[in-house]
Amino acid sequence: MGCVNSKQTVSVTPAIDHSGVFRDNVCSGSGRIVVEDLPPVTETKLLSWWSKSGKKSSSKKSGSELGSDFGELSESGRASSNCRSESVSFRLGNLSKYLEAEQVAAGWPAWLSNVAGEAIHGWVPFRSDAFEKLEKIGQGTYSSVFRARETETGRIVALKKVRFDNFEPESVRFMAREILILRKLNHPNIIKLEGIVTSKLSCSIHLVFEYMEHDLTGLLSSPDIDFTTPQIKCYMKQLLSGLDHCHARGVMHRDIKGSNLLVNNEGILKVADFGLANFCNASGNKQPLTSRVVTLWYRPPELLLGATEYGASVDLWSVGCVFAELLIGKPVLQGRTEVEQLHKIFKLCGSPPEDYWKKSKLPHAMLFKPQQHYDGCLRETLKLKGLSDADINLIETLLSIQPHKRGTASTALVSQYFTSKPFACDPSSLPVYSPSKEIDAKHREDTTRKKISGNGRRGTESRKPTRKPPAFAKLAPAEDVRHHSQKFQKRNGHSVHNSIDSDSTLFEKMQKPSNHEKDEASHVKNASQGDVPFSGPLQVSVSSGFAWAKRRKDDICVRSHNRSLSRGHIPNLLGPSPAFSENTDVDSKNNEKEKEEKHGERTDSQDREAYEMLKLSMLKKWRQLERPDSFGGSDEYHSQELSLELYQREEKAAKLGHLGYEDNDEKIEFSGPLLSKSYGVDELLERHERQIRQLVRKSWFQKGKKQGK
């Protein structure tokens, strides 16, 4: 970092003169301190001397005395002959405290230098104003990634803000482990840590990385990108090369997936996000590891079974999942829970033999052991996808249930897949794509979801929805939405909608967004017949949403009225539907004016008469619903919506106390749906649904009243 370009840097301090004063070597005015290198021999002597003398040391030594002792080292890093003389005495017992103080003086926060000083060994932090954040480009469990610009040079970098608790030493050590591992690795296919942004008083840090334009998840999800076999081999070769470098240095990544494999415009793939990485257990150190690592779709079976002793083979399973995803175009193992993920693995790759379960010491082995043995169908499944034998052989090796059969990254690089034609292409020959990351893929999915929701509508809505859908509407997945066919009739030059869904409700209508409001439609979902929130069986098709009203002088049969009632049959009372009308606001206002001119103002007596007729009609419907033999396809009540004119009439009637649900003798809920008592729908859920519909109706009424003014 800064001017410390060598990974072999050992010195922990800036150069110090004999007076104990820091001698700052400024690089291009950046204020970064040059750290001199010490040869390995001197480093070994210092460390051994520290370990032997540190415990015995009790006296303190001033900074100037220590400075003069360090001054015996020449600026070239070579120890002078006097270092070996007995007259030179290092009081290394307090050296660690001196180094902590030196790191704080260099700009590091005390909570970091006290707990994880080795992670920032020899580095100087960037200033907080050295970079300008532009936008977020990634989001992880423990971090957020931003695109940023270096203020001095204008260079684009990636800033990773790590989440941790600086008051908890273990949390700080967990964060610092990523820094230690990244400093240990140096490979073209491993992301490079360029520095750290923090200050003495800061409670957070930002890691500075080189900027990469793409990740594999974003490229795979792009509809315009289709990888060829040489391109896939190129990416896989780079991935395995980077992992081979990690494993050779005892590092497990433990979170290999498409979004952590970054690609730049030069076609170079780099393994990133070492937040869950750890060192492999040495033969003499069997410290238990956690099994709660690796994203679920890429997690190997031994971790799903609770293994606490594992090695680099966990990364190879994840590589196999990524490889199959590159070839097929989507993840091959998409479980929603750990149990389901394990079941999918056994069905595809086969379950382990009986000896594996007997010898296994995994905590969850007997708990998750399948009752029947699975032979696996991986080869047959991949052959159906048109993959070659070389492709299938490598995938089968990487996706072996038993870890020792997966081989290593180096053996995978010399497999038949890479040695047969067509060979891997050169990274420089890869096409330059538009920036594509996982977050871009999510945006595309959201846009597609909005389009699908918008296509469920045939008409355009001239007014914005007045409220968000209920909470239970947000829980319905998009794939559960079923679209019902709708028919339209042309009347008076306008499109009039007749629903053919027998039990469509107001909840359904509130779910359907307009085509020109796609920006607001991300939280609105379509509903269907099966989405009615009652737990009981709905065997009666009834009207819902708003009550019906119709002024009629002649008595008409209720059954024929139910069959024929539609907006076309009552043009004098029902205005254009707010949810399905294709008219604009201007057309709606013109229609209202025409109706007012044609019919004139309603008197209070007429309103009362109309509402009495309405209540009478609903009572007849209720009695009809009491008879089981009256249920039939011809008795479906078509849902209608109340116009502004009807609402005004109801408002006047409400003032006179003639609302049906306010009568003490006959209580009828006009917000529907009306269900037969004989079918015993849960009373609590029905009351909850009724309250929701009343609130929704009130919001629609209020909006209609405002627009009428």
UniProtKB/Swiss-Prot annotation:
Protein kinase domain boundaries: 131-418
Keywords: ATP-binding, Kinase, Lipoprotein, Myristate, Nucleotide-binding, Plant defense, Serine/threonine-protein kinase, Transferase
CDD domains, alphabetized: STKc_CDK9_like
Lipid-linked residues (N-myristoyl glycine): G2
InterPro entries assigned: CDK (IPR050108), Kinase-like_dom_sf (IPR011009), Prot_kinase_dom (IPR000719), Protein_kinase_ATP_BS (IPR017441), Ser/Thr_kinase_AS (IPR008271)
Basic and acidic residues: compositionally biased ranges: 437-449, 509-523, 586-609
GO CC annotations, alphabetized: plasma membrane
GO molecular function, one term: protein serine/threonine kinase activity
Segments of skewed composition (Basic residues): 484-494
EC number per UniProt: 2.7.11.-
Any GO BP annotation: regulation of salicylic acid mediated signaling pathway
Composition-biased stretches (Polar residues): 495-505
Keyword Transport belongs to the record: no
Region (Disordered): 53-80, 434-536, 566-609
Pfam families tied to this protein: Pkinase (PF00069)
Catalytic residues of the enzyme: D255 (proton acceptor)
Coiled-coil annotated residue ranges, if any: none
Disruption phenotype: Impaired in beta-aminobutyric acid (BABA)-induced sterility. Altered BABA-induced resistance (BABA-IR) against bacteria (e.g. P.syringae) and oomycetes (e.g. H.parasitica) associated with reduction in priming for salicylate (SA)-dependent defense responses (e.g. trailing necrosis and pathogenesis-related PR-1 gene expression). Reduced primed to be primed phenotype in transgenerationally primed plants exposed to a second BABA-priming.
Similarity comment: Belongs to the protein kinase superfamily. Ser/Thr protein kinase family.
Function: Required for beta-aminobutyric acid (BABA)-induced resistance (BABA-IR) against bacteria (e.g. P.syringae) and oomycetes (e.g. H.parasitica) via priming for salicylate (SA)-dependent defense responses such as pathogenesis-related PR-1 gene expression and trailing necrosis. Involved in BABA-mediated sterility. Necessary for the inheritance of BABA-priming to next generation, especially for the primed to be primed phenotype which consists in an enhanced second BABA-priming in transgenerationally primed plants.
Protein name: Protein IMPAIRED IN BABA-INDUCED STERILITY 1
Organism: Arabidopsis thaliana
Phylogenetic placement of the source organism: Eukaryota, Viridiplantae, Streptophyta, Embryophyta, Tracheophyta
Gene designation: IBS1
